[in-house]
From Swiss-Prot:
It is found in: Cytoplasm. The gene is tig. This is Trigger factor. Residues 162-243 form the PPIase FKBP-type domain. InterPro entries: PPIase_dom_sf, PPIase_FKBP_dom, Trig_fac, Trigger_fac_C, Trigger_fac_C_sf, Trigger_fac_ribosome-bd_bac, Trigger_fac_ribosome-bd_sf, Trigger_fact/SurA_dom_sf. Its main location: cytoplasm. Residues 427-444 have a biased composition (Polar residues). The keyword GTP-binding does not apply. Its EC number is 5.2.1.8. It comes from Thermobifida fusca (strain YX). It holds the Pfam family Trigger_C.
Length: 463
């Protein structure tokens, strides 16, 4: 087999492959065996007819076509391996010469990874947010804890802002009750703003057993967007009573005996949280600077494939949530054109990020151990709420275990860059690079989200 490679662009090549007929013997053997089982020739049992009779019965052209179709994928793979071509996606194949008994020649155009080196990746400078814990932040955490331990006490008075009420809602349009816009026994906190516009104003001042009607725009269901008259009936009014921030509360809400111990614990936890956020921010900003510093050509077909994958994933998520594409765009305050432009931009960024990290991992001869691969699967499964075995089986079934290896290598490549970066906070303090987190997911064009999503769906089904 003769092979040659022609560079059509920095991201696309054409392989020319010439094969003498004697190297197609295996393909013809497979073809004849397959056809012998399909045809019925008088005097021969199924599968036993000789090749010459099969040629005569089905036509030599049909035999050649089937043999070539069987041979080309394997010959293409051999040529790619021989020429060490870093292919991306399927090729466009064209048979250029087929001389029976002499030679088969064909070309294969295919996208390839761009050739480049990752240089000057040491000493990248980034600034991250301060991780200083303020008294106000600690107070906010304690207030949230108080809210969790609040009690509701029934009161015999008109409803006020912040009260909890039990209500019925009934909507009508032009005096006709809407059957799909009725609700009973709804618990609602006045001021939350989670239901209908105008509801808070209608409830305030009502006592248990009283009703009021207001006009609003429906936000869901068959009549979404229509103006309707809504009657709200209050069944009960309850006052939220918060516990005092004292030692008794500390013993109730924690393992501590005093409020000062609880306050110190919350400050420590908040500090750990802020430091973790700070280190994640450092990784994100180092990666952003690294990718921005490198200019490489990107295959349009790969960008399109990544954009299509992201679009299909969003469509499935919207379908599962019952939200239309139009409603999603409205919530995001984007037009279809703006959505598509952002989608393409993000896909382009993801493809480029993947190329950069893959190249760095290759340059530095990074590898991933079985322990690291297992840790990745375990932590990803935990974040998805399924068992590691479920995720592993899904990856196996989708033939995507190689993607786990790629993800771990990419994370290790980023760890390497971050470990050599110069990180300071906004106050000018030097931040030590984070401990390598090989299993942390990086937003690149890896294509594994679909498998992980299907694994998560399987886990929900089995619960």
């Amino acid at each position: 087999m003769k092979t040659a490679v022609e560079e059509l662009s920095p991201t696309r090549v054409k392989l020319t492959i010439e094969v003498p007929f004697e190297e197609l013997d295996h393909a013809f053997d497979v073809t004849y065996k397959s056809l012998a089982k399909q045809v019925r020739i008088k005097g021969f049992r199924p599968g036993k007819a000789p090749a010459k009779l099969i040629d005569r019965y089905v036509g030599r052209g049909a035999v050649l076509t089937q043999a070539v179709n069987h041979a080309v994928p394997e010959l293409y793979s051999e040529a790619v391996s021989k020429e060490e071509v870093p292919v991306l996606g399927p090729p466009e194949v064209e048979i250029t010469r087929l001389e029976d008994g002499k030679e088969l020649a064909f070309t294969a155009e295919v996208d390839v990874r761009p050739k480049f080196e990752v240089t000057d990746y040491e000493g990248i400078e980034v600034t991250v947010d301060d991780a200083e814990v303020t008294e106000e932040q600690v107070n906010e955490r304690l207030e949230a804890l108080r809210q969790r331990f609040a009690t509701l006490i029934g009161v015999d008075r008109p409803a006020e802002q912040g009260d909890h009420v039990s209500i019925d809602l009934s909507a009508s349009v032009d005096g006709k009750k809407l059957e799909d816009a009725q609700a009973s026994g709804v618990s609602y906190e006045i001021g939350a703003g989670t239901l209908l516009q105008g509801l808070d104003e209608a409830i305030i001042g009502l006592s248990a057993g009283e009703s009021a009607t207001f006009t609003t725009t429906l936000v869901g269901g068959e009549h979404k967007g229509r103006e309707a008259d809504v009657t709200v009936t209050v069944h009960s009014v309850k006052l939220k009573e918060l516990p005092e921030l004292d030692d008794e509360f500390a013993r109730l809400a924690s393992e501590f005996d005093t409020i000062e111990e609880l306050r110190a614990s919350e400050a420590e936890r908040l500090g750990e949280l802020l430091r973790a956020q700070q280190l994640r921010q450092a990784r994100d900003r180092v990666l952003e600077k690294l990718v921005d510093s490198i200019d490489i050509p990107l295959p349009e077909s790969v960008i399109k494939q990544e954009a299509d994958r992201r679009r299909e994933l969003l469509d499935r998520q919207l379908s599962q949530s019952g939200l239309s594409k139009e409603a999603y765009l409205e919530a995001q305050e984007k037009t279809e054109e703006e959505f598509e432009a952002e989608l393409t931009e993000n896909a382009t960024r993801a493809v480029k990020t993947g190329f950069v990290l893959d190249q760095l991992a290759s340059q530095e001869n990074l590898t991933a151990s079985n322990e690291e691969l297992t840790q990745y699967v375990v932590e990803q499964a935990q974040s998805m709420g399924i068992s590691p075995d479920q995720l592993f089986q899904s990856l196996m079934q989708a033939n995507q275990l190689q993607l786990v290896y790629v993800e771990v290598l990419r994370a290790k490549a980023l760890d390497l860059v971050v470990s050599k970066a110069k990180i300071t906070d906004e106050s000018g303090n030097t931040i030590e690079p984070p401990t390598p987190v090989h299993t942390e997911t990086i937003t690149v064009a890896s294509g594994d989200e679909e498998t992980e999503e299907s694994a998560a769906e399987q886990g929900e089904t089995e619960k």
